[in-house]
Amino acid sequence: MKRNTNSSNKTRRLVLIGALGGISIFLGISGLGLIRLPIFSLTIMHIPVIIGALLEGPIVGIAVGLIFGLFSMYQNITAPGLTSFIFWNPIIALIPRILIGVISYYSFKLLKHKIKNTGICVGISAILGTLTNTVGVLGLTYILYLDRYAQAREISREAVAGTLLTV
């Protein structure tokens, strides 16, 4: 009997999206995915997005990134904090998270032809995916909410600009 590999691939991708999306949500709910600092939070919730993209391609990365972004919106709507308004905006909550998988996958694909060491390619791609999230969220916050963010934190525009642009 001939096995339908296309159906098997779709099933594997769907399972991976569910598993990695679930890990992202677990990291968010448990608090293990966030490191809270006075002015902003660092996250490791993007790591499942990178893993999905590198294992199964950009579609899986996009799907897991979308789950990460939607959960971020949900968290900031249901348990708002001082600067939650930033993540109520789908441009900030979703686009950088979706792009993590795209950038990670295509940078890996490009690098593997230039660099023979797969581990180095994975490392560079993971760094680029991480930077996609960081630069995307902080850059869009700067562009869209600089004054409102400064007011919420009760600090000057210059202090916010310096912080956002140097992180």
State each model region's role:
Residues 1-167:
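Loop-helix junctions at membrane interfaces
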